[in-house]
Amino acid sequence: MISISLPVDKYRPSSLSSLLVEGLGAYPESVWLGSNYLCLFDSQNTVESLQPDFKTLMSLPDGLGVIVTAPSSKSEYDFVSRYFAPRIGIDEDHATGSAHCMLVPFWAKRLSRSKLDAFQASPRGGLFRGEVLGEKVRLRGNTEEFLKGTIRL
């Protein structure tokens, strides 16, 4: 298990654009904007069944990508999410720490808790334990090793 502390990604309410609805193929309950769009849906099933149009999402005027989230239907997690970022070459990321810098504070406020368990419902899946610590978010989770090496400076 690894742990990393990152700055909170501040967000503000945003209007629901037709491009966002078209790109996701569904209407979120509400939308916020920080470094990414954050779209709240009513159910885990809705989040898991989204089949985004990545070409349309690529044409959104703001944000690096789109985070979709909903309360978890399973007791072992507080919320679920997925992250789509075709503008930066990632249709769907498996486990996105930077997205959780927005998600953990968002859900902490909604649930009145500072420590949360999250599931990123990508095809591979990702588990996070997040904690809001002032202006930082501490994330813990297991990693998938993809590169090993030595750098000499």
Regions found by a protein language model. Name each.
Residues 1-153:
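Active-site proximal loop and beta-alpha junction motif in alpha/beta enzyme cores
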